Amino acid sequence: MESQCRPNVDGVHNGVESHVKVVEKPRSVGSSSEFVLRILGLLLTLIAAVVAGVDKQTKIIPLTLIKTLPSLHVPVTAKWSDMSAFVYLVVSNAIACSYAAISLVLVTMLGRRGKGGRVLAVIVLDLHMVGLLFSANGAATAVGVLGQYGNSHVEWKKVCNVFDSFCHHLVASLALSFLGSLSFLGLVLLAILNLHKKSSTK
């Protein structure tokens, strides 16, 4: 009796041939979006850190000590390590880049089988990266505005009219860093959307 009820190896059950097609479930859109955003965050923060980290320009500046004497021409170098705000920008992007690489590996390994605690830890760290990058971008932007326009109230002169290449590289680094912070912000928003979907389906 048991042999009559069991299907044969070739897919024949009680004299009727059946064709079973196994279809793998495609990766969800949310997982694909998360992967893309982490790759973008990794690349953007890496390039931002490199662009700012190699930023350096030397110019010959005329220096007048006494009005009756001719000006002295002194070589002056502007580099990112001269200002703490720019150091903060480079270090923050380096941290975010390293975290993006590690989180990319973790998320790939965890997949859908990841425990809730580990997934929540990644989301919290994503949120920390958003705060870190936005604070670094804000600090560097404030110093950059002073370099571009100066401050007449405290007699701070603008320097970007002299070190133009230096300032242009910093603007490019800031733009990349800002886009990188938006990538991490997108990850946080995506996580909130996924949590909302899970709670609504329960």
UniProtKB/Swiss-Prot annotation:
Compartment(s): Cell membrane
Keywords, A to Z, come to:
Cell membrane, Membrane, Transmembrane, Transmembrane helix
What are its GO cellular component terms? plasma membrane
Membrane topology, as annotated, equals:
Multi-pass membrane protein
Query: Looking at the keywords, is Cell membrane present?
Result: yes
The superkingdom listed in its UniProt entry is: Eukaryota
Signal sequence interval, chain numbering: none
Q: Name one Pfam family in it.
A: CASP_dom
InterPro entries in the cross-refs: CASP/CASPL (IPR006459), CASP_dom (IPR006702), CASPL (IPR044173)
| Residue ranges that the UniProt entry lists as topological domain Extracellular | 55-85, 140-172
> Where is this protein chiefly located?
membrane
Span-the-membrane segments of this chain are 34-54, 86-106, 119-139, 173-193
User: Which residues point to the Cytoplasmic side?
Assistant: 1-33, 107-118, 194-202
Record's PANTHER family?
CASP-LIKE PROTEIN 1U1
Q: How does it assemble?
A: Homodimer and heterodimers.
Family listed: Belongs to the Casparian strip membrane proteins (CASP) family.
NCBIfam families attached to this UniProt entry: A_tha_TIGR01569
Q: What is this protein called?
A: CASP-like protein 1E1
Please name the source species: Vitis vinifera (Grape)
